Regions:
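Acidic, Ser/Thr/Gly/Pro-rich intrinsically disordered interaction regions
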Residues: 1-92, 100-234
């Protein structure tokens, strides 16, 4: 059996998080929890993208629910439930990526005052200006630019503990509308008129936050040799 060539070392295709994951051990001696957090930040974001692609593929299945409703006057809405579960998982994975990113920060700056081991508290401390004066400005900016975080956190908290919401295709707009009666805002059930627009917006927000954090952490790496597996060459 002939083994082909497989190039694994390709930094020209890596973002700041992936680059950091390859080279940080020459500078930072992270604990196992920190190492898992670096890996988790990547893995959860990739899972969110995979789930997003799957959700798009499931959209046509909603027509089966509509056909059942038209024929029998009711529908079990199985396909809508499946799509809703995938959609909710996307948001949970994205929050987990943010959470893992914060864990990396917490471990690296564990000796600084006001850097709590909680993502919610971490964001609040930065918003309130209650942190060690030595804390890097770029990491402060990353949080203060993330004005979307608080609403995102509330959504994540609710989705973690509630039953699955529902979705359907709006006949007038052709957009996929998502609704959750258990999640209320000012006494009204959560309704998102275009859930895929919301997903794309959240993907971009999280990607920007993670990118800014690890772009800064990359600048803190020492110019030290790091052993890398480059690939399989035949």
């Amino acid at each position: 059996m002939t083994i082909g060539t497989a190039k694994i070392f390709a930094p020209e295709h890596w973002g700041s998080l992936e680059k950091f994951s390859k080279f940080y051990n020459g500078t930072f001696s992270l604990k196992d929890s920190g190492k898992r957090a670096v890996s988790g930040a990547i893995s959860h974001f990739r899972k969110a993208i995979t789930l997003h692609n799957l959700a798009i593929k499931l959209v046509p299945n909603l027509e089966t629910d509509e056909a059942e409703l038209d024929k029998h006057g009711y529908t079990s809405a199985v396909n809508a439930q499946e799509l809703s579960a995938i959609i909710e998982s996307i948001f949970l994975e994205l929050y987990s990526s943010v959470d893992c990113t914060r864990k990396v920060i917490t471990e690296i700056y564990s000796n600084y005052q006001g850097i709590p081991n909680s993502t919610r508290k971490y964001f609040n401390r930065i918003y309130e200006g209650n942190f060690d004066e030595r804390f890097p400005e770029q990491l402060i900016i990353a949080v203060r630019e993330a004005t979307w975080y608080e609403d995102f956190r509330k959504m994540r908290d609710e989705l973690t503990h509630l039953e699955t919401g529902s979705c359907h295709k709006n006949k007038d707009t052709a957009k996929i509308q998502y609704m959750h009666t258990g999640f209320t805002i000012e006494g009204r059930a959560l309704v998102i008129d275009d859930i895929f627009e919301k997903i794309n917006q959240t993907l971009n927000n999280v990607n920007q936050f993670i990118g800014r954090v690890f772009a800064y952490l990359l600048t803190q790496l020492k110019d030290e040799p790091v052993l890398q597996f480059c690939g399989i060459f035949h």
